[in-house]
Amino acid sequence: MQVIRLEALSDNYIFLLYDDKRNIAAVVDPAEAQPVLKKLAELKADLVAIFNTHHHNDHVGGNKQLIEKFPQLIVYGGAEDRGRIPGQKVFLQQGDRVEFADRIAEVIFVPGHTRAHIAYYFPPQEASETGDLFCGDTLFSGGCGRLFEGTPTQMVDSLSKLRSLPDNTRIWCAHEYTLKNLQFALTVDGDNADLQRRFNEVKAYRSRGEATIPSLLGVEKHTNPFLRWDQASLQSTVKSSDGVQTFARIREMKNNF
């Protein structure tokens, strides 16, 4: 399975999953249809599935046009998003599985950004390979999504699920927010040498117009403050010994950054 990153809107990424054996594709969170249709035409491939992580328009905006072009495709989304995702036919819950290109993705229920948010995790097929996590707006490179419908407790639980995955998991999040996220991270975790190094690397990438997605989960664990709510240095910064409260205070600081 090949993952093809497509740019959309101002800072969105759409991920096209391509099965070159069968010349078919699936797409994760099509913010708009045109970039997907253009790449499918180049590949001369059929689209068989849409994997939506949540209902926000910058993740489902292309659904209707893609369904019109490929009426047999199947739209997957979270069970609690029923009625909110255009064309949804499959309603997924924690622990469900979906198959594409001889790989099986595990569905992880990750409420917080929205009440129905899910992520798709494709474990590696071989020990030497990477897994692939399509996490929408739950976990970002260097950050996490705002809490529009969920609570800090829910988000910490959701991020705990993602944090437990292997370090070599590739993080395919839906926005190019890394540089600004790390600028904020330095304000709450400025003595973190790993974070300082990463910020300089990302700054160089973006100066060359290069994407920072995918990230690796192992890197996130050491540099993303929203996965480090139980670290003493961050708890000291926000003056709390409680993990959820630490997360909530950091999230509020980021909202106002």
Curated annotation (Swiss-Prot):
Pathway: Secondary metabolite metabolism; methylglyoxal degradation; (R)-lactate from methylglyoxal: step 2/2
EC number(s) from the headed UniProt entry: 3.1.2.6
GO molecular function: hydroxyacylglutathione hydrolase activity; metal ion binding
Keyword Lipoprotein in annotation: no
Record note on cofactor: Binds 2 Zn(2+) ions per subunit.
Cofactors required: Zn(2+)
Enzyme class: hydrolase
Keyword Hydrolase in annotation: yes
Binding site for Zn(2+) 2: D58, H59, D137, H175
Residues annotated as binding Zn(2+) 1: H54, H56, H113, D137
Chemical reaction(s) catalysed: an S-(2-hydroxyacyl)glutathione + H2O = a 2-hydroxy carboxylate + glutathione + H(+)
One GO BP annotation of this record: methylglyoxal catabolic process to D-lactate via S-lactoyl-glutathione
Record SUPFAM superfamilies: Metallo-hydrolase/oxidoreductase
Keywords: Hydrolase, Metal-binding, Zinc
Pfam families assigned: HAGH_C, Lactamase_B
UniProt subunit comment: Monomer.
Family: Belongs to the metallo-beta-lactamase superfamily. Glyoxalase II family.
Classification via HAMAP family: Glyoxalase_2
Stated role: Thiolesterase that catalyzes the hydrolysis of S-D-lactoyl-glutathione to form glutathione and D-lactic acid.
Protein name according to UniProt: Hydroxyacylglutathione hydrolase
Organism from which the protein derives: Nostoc punctiforme (strain ATCC 29133 / PCC 73102)
